[in-house]
Curated annotation (Swiss-Prot):
Its EC number is 6.1.1.17. Transmembrane segments: none annotated. The gene is gltX1. Belongs to the class-I aminoacyl-tRNA synthetase family. Glutamate--tRNA ligase type 1 subfamily. Monomer. This is Glutamate--tRNA ligase 1. Zn(2+) binds at residues 102, 104, 129, 131. Its cofactor is Zn(2+). It is found in: Cytoplasm. One of its GO terms (cellular component) is cytosol. It catalyses: tRNA(Glu) + L-glutamate + ATP = L-glutamyl-tRNA(Glu) + AMP + diphosphate. It comes from Syntrophus aciditrophicus (strain SB).
Length: 472
């Protein structure tokens, strides 16, 4: 068996649903630990639950991992393809009298469980078949012969030392009556044979760990290091679930979050480096360590994630932001714009946008030469006297030579001075003429991006709209 020298971590999801926030954080921590130590990150799909495992879920998990940028060095390895190996190792334990066949029925076990609870005892298999030396037969399970004395110590890299009395541990089932290995057995064989040196997983697995350590010892395997990550809670301090909002990684993609924002947020759910909030992936790889993961549960804060997403939208490479916007425009029926026009739109909108959905939805006026005018805004701002001011703007623009951002700013200031009005008098009417609404990027930015011809045409259309009486 391979000695545990190289750092090798793994992520081993069950393909029974989508990749959720908790699993993604576990994968991220395992990935970062491997990358920090120049080790290997292995992806294993634990698909031995034949009834619940689906190809669709497997694809969704792989897509989510890829979107987050968590590339794997080996795999995906499918656990179901290794069942013959698991069965061979179970036979080895039976042959060595470290496991035995059990014929106790589920009804009998349930009755014993109820009796133990009624008598104030912790439910535990009573060893009925432990010394019977039963042969294999249809419907039997295989149980591991757990030591009945001594203490098993888990030297957890996050939680510290945890001790378990062996007498409190069951003779756990390692092969079900259908012939398939149980989770606790298959995971030990797979981790050992794949040379996994560090098992980083959620703390709901803490109680599995002493049983797994005993299995490692019985099979003659090196025992890996374990690190159990505290769970993620909602704002109400209950375990994170759908009632707290989206929990699927790809749901956040669909809502317009950037993968860098989600990765940055997930790593801060339990891990910290001083007061630093924003980390590049290279920084995370350089700084990450299990010793900086807190022992208490982390609370999921959607507002903080939104703040991070807004930061990344502001700082994302322009061409990359234009690229990731395309699917959201497509959903709105908007064709991909000319690259130069698209970049200008991105520059206009990125400062205010919190998500890519926000960005796409607030950009529609750039693609519609007759943007729908908000009725309430029209009633408030598009008064008859405004028509004259807008008409003057359109006429003066036609002869404007310097149609740059600075030139537009000077033009607007000069025009309001000449007409003895304040800029705010025409700012909102002009904004409505160009966009149909009262909230948008700066006027000079919009005018520069739309171009002189579009701006003049939209102003003239709005003047006609006012004089037709439609604004009142």
């Amino acid at each position: 068996m391979q000695k545990l020298k190289e750092i090798r971590t793994r992520f081993a999801p069950s393909p029974t649903g989508y990749l959720h926030i908790g699993g993604a954080r576990t994968a991220l921590f395992s990935w970062l630990y491997a990358r920090h130590h120049q080790g290997k990150f292995v992806l294993r799909i634990e698909d031995t639950d034949q009834l619940r495992s689906t190809e669709e879920s497997t694809r969704a998990i792989l897509d989510a991992m890829t979107w987050l940028g968590l590339n794997w060095d080996e795999g995906p390895v499918f656990q179901a393809e290794r069942v013959d190996i698991h069965r061979a190792m179970i036979r080895k334990l039976v042959d060595e009298d470290k496991a035995y066949y059990c014929t106790c029925t589920p009804d009998e076990l349930e009755e014993k469980r109820k009796r133990a609870l009624a008598e104030g005892r912790k439910p535990k298999y009573d060893g009925t078949c432990r010394e019977k030396k039963l042969p294999p037969s249809p419907g039997t399970v295989v149980r591991f012969r757990c030591p009945q004395t001594g203490i098993t110590v888990v030297d957890d890299l996050i939680k510290g030392k945890i001790s378990f009395n062996n007498e409190e541990l069951d003779d756990l089932i390692i092969q079900r009556s259908d012939g398939y290995p149980t989770y606790n057995f298959a995971v030990v064989v797979d981790d050992a044979q794949m040379g996994i040196s560090h098992v980083i997983r959620g703390d709901d697995h803490v109680n599995n760990t002493p049983r797994q350590i005993l299995l490692y010892q019985a099979l003659g395997y090196d025992i890996p290091h374990f690190g159990h990550v505290p769970m993620i809670l909602g704002a109400d301090k209950a375990r994170l679930s759908k009632r707290h909002g989206a929990t699927s990684v790809m749901a956040y993609k669909d809502m317009g979050y950037l993968p860098e924002a989600l990765v940055n947020y997930l790593v801060r759910l339990g891990w910290s480096h001083g007061d630093q909030e924003i980390f590049s992936l290279d920084e995370l790889i350089a700084l990450f360590g299990l010793e900086s993961i807190g022992k208490s549960a982390a609370v999921f804060n959607p507002e903080k994630l939104l703040w991070l997403n807004q930061h990344y939208i502001k700082t994302y490479p322009e061409d990359r932001l234009l690229e990731v916007l395309q699917p959201f425009w497509k959903q709105l029926g908007i064709e991909a714009p000319d690259p130069d026009y698209g970049r200008s739109i991105v520059r206009d909108l990125r400062a205010r946008a919190k998500t890519l959905v926000d960005m796409a939805e607030s950009s529609t006026f750039y693609f519609n030469d007759e943007p729908a005018i908000d009725a309430d805004a029209a009633k408030k701002f598009l008064t008859p006297e405004i028509a004259g001011h807008l008409e003057a703007i359109a006429e003066a623009l036609a002869t404007l030579g310097d149609y740059s951002k600075e030139g537009i700013e000077i033009f607007l200031r000069s025009l309001v001075e000449a007409r003895a009005i304040k800029l705010k008098t025409i700012a909102q009417p002009l904004r409505i003429a160009l966009t149909g609404k009262t909230v948008s990027p700066g006027l000079d930015d919009i005018m520069l991006t739309l171009g002189k011809e579009r701006v003049i045409a939209r102003i003239q259309r709005t003047v006609a709209y006012i004089r037709s009486g439609m604004a009142s």
